[in-house]
From Swiss-Prot:
Lineage, highest ranks first: Bacteria, Bacillati, Bacillota, Bacilli, Bacillales
Protein name in the entry: Pyridoxal 5'-phosphate synthase subunit PdxT
PANTHER family in the cross-refs: PYRIDOXAL 5'-PHOSPHATE SYNTHASE SUBUNIT SNO (PTHR31559), PYRIDOXAL 5'-PHOSPHATE SYNTHASE SUBUNIT SNO1-RELATED (PTHR31559:SF0)
Protein family according to the UniProt entry: Belongs to the glutaminase PdxT/SNO family.
Main function: Catalyzes the hydrolysis of glutamine to glutamate and ammonia as part of the biosynthesis of pyridoxal 5'-phosphate. The resulting ammonia molecule is channeled to the active site of PdxS.
């Protein structure tokens, strides 16, 4: 198995290290050719506007939108914003997950926090680092909420994709990455 990590900006190295600890090969994706032969793709946390500009500069937007129909994707923090079909302010990016996301929903940088979450299917007390984090205000058809803080959904999935508001790659807790790996394996087993 090879999982790609969008390598234009953000916590790329941290995701790569997490996947290596789980025994998974990685590919840093900076061009459409880098998408060949990967089994899944992670959109790391970072600054969503900057990531979008770089996606456009590298000519990746259209190919990523097409890949979103068949390639499992996992978005963390800014990656969740990129995968959303709708944002409360501004245009959407990839539209891979039918959900409405609010950027910086928990406040500014100074309001960043850490907590533990119970994530359905992935485990109890999962470490979660929230930095200028978004949350999901509304989910569409086929989207399951796996964890929430109050009424704010912070981990969601579809049959194909996974997204979270926080940075699991900035902790030592590998369970959310492992959940994504198992999601890919289940999909691969079904399609064989």
């Amino acid at each position: 198995m090879v999982i790609g990590i969008l390598g234009v900006q953000g916590a790329v190295r941290e995701h790569q290290e997490m996947l290596h600890l789980l025994g998974v090969k990685t590919m840093i994706v900076k061009s459409s050719a880098d998408l060949d032969g990967i089994d899944g793709l992670i959109f790391p946390g970072g600054e969503s506007t900057t990531i979008r500009r770089l996606i456009d500069r590298y000519g990746l937007l259209d190919v990523l939108r097409r890949q979103a129909d068949t390639l499992p994707m996992f978005g963390t923090c800014a990656g969740m914003i990129l995968l959303a079909s709708e944002l409360t302010e501004g245009p959407s990016h990839l539209g891979a997950i039918p959900m409405t996301v609010r950027r910086n929903a928990f406040g500014r940088q100074i309001d960043s926090f850490e907590t533990s979450l119970n994530v359905e299917g992935a485990g109890q007390d999962i470490e979660a680092v929230f930095i200028r984090a978004p949350f999901v205000e509304q989910v569409g058809e086929g989207v399951r909420v796996l964890a929430a803080i109050g009424i704010a959904a912070v981990v969601v999935e579809t049959d194909l994709h996974l997204a979270c508001s926080f940075h699991p790659e900035l902790t030592s807790d590998r369970r959310l990455h492992d959940y994504f790996i198992q999601k890919i394996r289940r999909r691969t087993a079904v399609s064989v």
